[in-house]
């Protein structure tokens, strides 16, 4: 896996992250010393990507568990409070909730203070390895949908630095590279924080994958002029009926895919599904600081005091999605029934 940059490292009971806000200018690794720093790292997007946030949150909980003192009951209460604080950092992505739910069960069921952090550590490491395998399997299924020479458009960053390895939407491009299959990627810059420009092009170029950067308002023209054959995106939350929350701008890509008659794919692990929500109407959409829109590199790009609407995500209705690609396979024409048939017992 030498082609991948590790965005989360857990060694010697310490969590270290690649500060993604400094890319592409600098590869800076930040050691996480305490919970407040970890929460700030999530909120300020130094660590980002739904799977990566969940893995990071798990390791932070482990790190805190090894530092607990007092009785078993006190340690349990303290760690459940830590878990709740981590969960509150990013309301839209569901992966973090799913990971913390698993770890919370271990906290509640622990019978000795000594075993508590050890069991949490084992589970967090297991989840990290599972995510790497899951991402690769998503890539395997996604690659089957593409042909040699395809030109595929994506938004934001659903790559290796947003997961343990490979990524979700970018996984097929890594596998195509490994197998010598030529695919071209067009990366939409992804305003206002430029994850497509700063992160996706950085990691794909680093891996030797053919990638071209475009601005967000070039998408329709690019689909037409460059004969884009498909669009693939990641996801932060998928409801029971297949409605998908992802980076703001995804919904309009789905509409353009429908207009041009090209497939629109969502690539995501089972941990991104929220089976407690029937539709996208139930998803809480995070709104972020206005300065992300009114400033660039600390300089004003809009007049002071102008009202700003800055949602971080939008919801793409399931009927605009050609297929959802998971580690279990491809869910074509996603809705409640097709998702249930593919995922089966995982819906319960």
Curated annotation (Swiss-Prot):
Enzyme's top EC category = isomerase
Binding residue positions for substrate: 48-50, 90, 195, 246-247
Going by the UniProt record, its keywords in alphabetical order are: Amino-acid biosynthesis, Isomerase, Methionine biosynthesis
Molecular function terms from GO? S-methyl-5-thioribose-1-phosphate isomerase activity
InterPro entries recorded: IF-2B-related (IPR000649), IF-M1Pi (IPR005251), IF_2B-like_C (IPR042529), Initiation_fac_2B_a/b/d (IPR011559), M1Pi_N (IPR027363), NagB/RpiA_transferase-like (IPR037171)
Q: Which cysteines are joined by disulfide bonds?
A: none
Instruction: Name the domain of life this protein comes from.
Output: Bacteria
Task: Indicate the annotated site residue(s) for Transition state stabilizer.
Answer: 156
Q: Where is the active site?
A: 236
Give, as in the UniProt entry, the pathway in which the protein acts: Amino-acid biosynthesis; L-methionine biosynthesis via salvage pathway; L-methionine from S-methyl-5-thio-alpha-D-ribose 1-phosphate: step 1/6
Spell out the reaction equation it catalyses: 5-(methylsulfanyl)-alpha-D-ribose 1-phosphate = 5-(methylsulfanyl)-D-ribulose 1-phosphate
Q: Name one GO biological process term.
A: L-methionine salvage from methylthioadenosine
Alphabetical list of SUPFAM superfamilies matching this protein:
NagB/RpiA/CoA transferase-like
EC number(s) reported in the record: 5.3.1.23
User: What family does this chain come from, according to its entry?
Assistant: Belongs to the eIF-2B alpha/beta/delta subunits family. MtnA subfamily.
What does the function comment of this entry state?
Catalyzes the interconversion of methylthioribose-1-phosphate (MTR-1-P) into methylthioribulose-1-phosphate (MTRu-1-P).
What is the protein name stated in its UniProt record? Answer: Methylthioribose-1-phosphate isomerase
Source organism of this protein record: Exiguobacterium sibiricum (strain DSM 17290 / CCUG 55495 / CIP 109462 / JCM 13490 / 255-15)
Gene name in the database record: mtnA
